[in-house]
């Protein structure tokens, strides 16, 4: 029942034509490409898109399939959460834990529509936690094979969640194996290095842009602290879902850490190792000193490690004040969704603007071997409606578009840098095509890029909201 409530809450947020956030059409384009060409339109880790394509095959509608995946895939977390919580023989713990995770403000008001890959891989991390909790109950062969298999699932699904999994398992292993022999440690380090090298090699092949970002992060780790999240917290005129998540992550990890210390004798060794690992991960991932380019994603994922720790702690401690503190933290988390539910979720366009955008697309067909330039969010809708390659507006001046016969620009009238030119006639109607270019892929947008640039050309078609400008 708790899982059904979570699914219903997610579906209620995606009832409009456009998904919340800026990147919903990215998933539409990727799924269409999988169904049409058995490949992705933009380079990315493929598993979630293939699952969405399978759903689309069943329901016969790509946007509906993406909407279903947005609601159902995160709800799979209910299975491992139930299996973890039932170990502690607390009657209402499984249901409450499932509700807190599925109705968490980050789950509803940050992941929905925009970060489907992030939320879709969260259940796998809960399954990894289940394996670690049962480490001393199951055979080591079964546990290791399970961890390897689950890691591979994450590795072909989402890079950020892979970092979370490595952090959780790595910290757990450090606590578990701290009294092991030097030979055992050296063997473990060798295995970890080999696994990391293999995963980086796979990332370099599947998503070169993410591999380059990871290498840049390793070589210049100070970059992660540029434009720290606390600047946004201090200067923002209103509270945001991620500000709430940062406060919850920081304070909860400290409070739960104190409870764990006072009641450490009540935990099994495996449980204690996992709790310590989860609290360290939560505190680091939700830190406000992390730069905004990374902060939102890491803070969003920290709800997983925090939830795992809270379940184990509530199930293990016996003192009333300690249980009460965990209960209060869970209640605050759920109640924090109420003020956020009154706010309108950000979308690429209003309903009227989206109607005008589709009207524009219906009157113009873009020739083969063309690319459309548009602002973030609009580029994915352009790829969806015009079935062509796209490039992000803020990258246009540095992007190599020399291989394209034509370059077009989506001008939002009254919003972005104006185009120029007369009202040219519509082009002839050639066959449409879409390439597998990396341009326009779902990359992270650095916060210091200009919001708009001037792109000029000949207006091919316009309506009350948009103009299609031919740049060359």
Each language-model region and where it sits:
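Transmembrane alpha-helical segments
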Residues: 104, 313, 325-349, 372-374
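Short periplasmic/luminal acceptor-recognition loop of GT-C membrane glycosyltransferases, typified by
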Residues: 336, 346-355, 362-426, 435-438, ...
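Hydrophobic/aromatic-rich transmembrane helices and adjacent perimembrane loops
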Residues: 118, 163-164, 290-319
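Membrane-interface helix-loop-helix junctions at transmembrane boundaries of multi-pass membrane enzymes
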Residues: 86, 139-140, 177-190, 253-281, ...
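Extracytoplasmic catalytic/substrate-binding loops of multi-pass membrane glycan-assembly enzymes
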Residues: 15-30, 40-54, 61, 348-356
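Transmembrane catalytic cores of multi-pass membrane glycosyltransferases
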Residues: 6-14, 23, 44-45, 116-117, ...
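Membrane-interface helix caps and helix-loop-helix hairpins in membrane proteins
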Residues: 15-16, 107-117, 289-296, 345
